[in-house]
Amino acid sequence: MRIRIALFAAAFLAALALRVGVLLSVTTNYDLESFSTAVEILRRHGALYLETSRYNYSPVWAHVLLGLDTAAWRADSTLAQTLGGFLLLFDAATALLLARLAGGGRRGAAVALVFFANPVSIFVSSFHLQFDGVALFFLLVALWCAERPEPERGGTVAALSASLLVKHVTAFFPPLFVRTRRRREGLPWLAAAVPYAVFAASFLPYARQWTGIRAHVLGYRSLAEDYGTAMLLQIPGAPSWLPTAVFLASIAAALVLLRGVALRRACLLLSLVTLLTVPGIAEYYFVWPIALGALSGGAGYLVYTLAVTAFFLGSPDGLNLPLTHLPGWHGVWWSLLLWFALEVRRLEREGRAAPA
């Protein structure tokens, strides 16, 4: 027992050292420059959504950045290091929460380690300094509140609202928490709408900047890469709206089909569908299913992790190593499709094994 505990502790410390080492190697990147621009605009009380097209989120995150920048100045540090430390704390909290969701004990420690040592999570939080993991942490909090023996509906709604306020990558998840025949303790539809109302209300102080909000937040489509549904535009005569239409139709179908699926599995499958069909992509999006996937593991999770890690090694926005035959955008997409197919097959097997 002591040896096992020592091994787990050593593994967590090694993962922590790797995260800190990667963080200390980063001085700036494109997104950090965008964050700095948002901070500078807020400091002089400028028009956040009109003066730059590079801030695409709710105002809440901009004010978090302002606070982190102030803390960095007082500590004689940099925004990169302060932001990285902030993200590291949330990843550590995510690992602890995953351990609780996994039931604690040996399995809980293993699930926490699978996430905390995952190269994809390390790359996104410590190298890219992206904050998707913060939004996903609050999604996990909502899941934890919903799955308690006596579900905490208020906590679920608050956590879903916080997740959307941080980054609206979880915009399609609240309907999964609605009451169904299988999830009788789920949220009423009105309660599930609260996170959207909170997200919309966060923009009220910036109502005069509506044109910028519409263009840079609601109209933001990320990067156009040769990935997933964007390849539909290679079809001669394909309309420009086709990838978005396929994406929205896929999300709608998933929300309907997943109503009878256990909540944590439904959340994972929705994250996979979202990432498979999203019409615009950035490489840090690949962290979206990592925390949820750690709860179930499996061959699909492993293959996807390896594919994304190899992609980061060769990506110009990653380590840009001069190695040939590393997977590109298509390789990651196919690994994601494999993971999705394996999860669907697992779900079907569990359904057949369930008592009638």
Label for each model-derived stretch:
Residues G108-A112, L136, R153-L160, A171, ...:
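Alpha-helical transmembrane segments and their helix-entry boundary regions
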Residues S163, V198, V273-T274, P289-G293, ...:
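Generic hydrophobic alpha-helical scaffold/packing signal
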Residues R2-R148, T180-V273, V278, A282-E283, ...:
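Primarily membrane-embedded glycan-assembly and transfer machineries that use lipid-linked glycans
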Residues F138, F172, A282-A310:
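Hydrophobic/aromatic-rich transmembrane helices and adjacent perimembrane loops
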Residues T156-L164, V169-T180, Y285-W288:
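Transmembrane-embedded, aromatic-rich helix segments that form part
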Residues F90, L165-V169, A310:
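Membrane-embedded alpha-helical segments of transport systems
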